[in-house]
């Protein structure tokens, strides 16, 4: 028994002794992940503000697009977004704060209450089967792709695909 323990200890020490201390990992990217995430946030922020006439947002609600969609006109400026919609009066606009941030991905979030967006994500009581249920609207979106002409978003909670086109 003592002989077996000695053999196992010698084998364990031999395995530890054969391990190399010169492990080097190859870099697949030119920059760190934090720097790439910050650069993507800055790029998306600039794209949102760069459209001179704003954006048309095709905003779909409901689980699996079950409740259809609405059109929102959005103009991003600094940290504020001004919106108009077919739900509001012809000359009425609504302003709120927004942010572009990096969580698990680059995200567009409408931070303060804006009834054109948040209405669909707040509990509706008798309007849904669940008294605490919502109409399936998001107010935080993952930015899937972004260019000067088109930004594709995906709702963080319900996963509906939202498209924004530059005007």
Predicted regions and their residues:
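Acidic/polar, low-complexity intrinsically disordered N-terminal segments immediately downstream
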Residues: 22-107, 146, 158
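Contiguous, well-ordered beta-strand patches that form the walls/edges
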Residues: 84-138
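Bacterial N-terminal signal peptides that target proteins for export
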Residues: 1-9
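Signature of short aromatic-glycine-proline-rich micro-motifs recurring in repeat-based ectodomains
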Residues: 70-72, 135-140
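C-terminal motif of bacterial Sec signal peptides marking the signal peptidase cleavage site
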Residues: 16-20
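Helix-rich interaction surfaces within compact, conserved domain-sized segments
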Residues: 133-134, 143-145
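Preference for solvent-exposed, low-hydrophobicity sequence contexts
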Residues: 157-167
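Short, exposed beta-strand-loop hairpins at the edges of beta-sheets
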Residues: 152-155
């Amino acid at each position: 028994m003592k002989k077996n323990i000695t053999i196992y200890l010698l084998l364990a020490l031999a395995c530890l002794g054969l391990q190399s201390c010169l492990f080097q990992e190859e870099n697949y990217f030119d920059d760190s992940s934090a720097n790439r995430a910050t650069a993507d946030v800055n790029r998306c922020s600039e794209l949102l503000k760069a459209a001179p006439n704003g954006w048309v947002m095709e905003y779909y609600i409901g689980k699996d697009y079950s409740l259809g969609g609405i059109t929102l006109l959005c103009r991003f400026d600094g940290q504020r977004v001004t919106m108009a919609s077919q739900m509001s009066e012809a000359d009425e606009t609504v302003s709120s704060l927004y942010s572009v941030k990096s969580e698990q991905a680059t995200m567009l979030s409408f931070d303060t209450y804006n009834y054109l967006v948040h209405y669909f994500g707040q509990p509706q009581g008798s309007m849904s089967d669940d008294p605490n249920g919502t109409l399936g609207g998001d107010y935080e979106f993952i930015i899937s792709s972004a260019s000067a002409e088109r930004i594709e978003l995906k709702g963080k909670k319900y996963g509906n695909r939202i498209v924004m086109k530059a005007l």
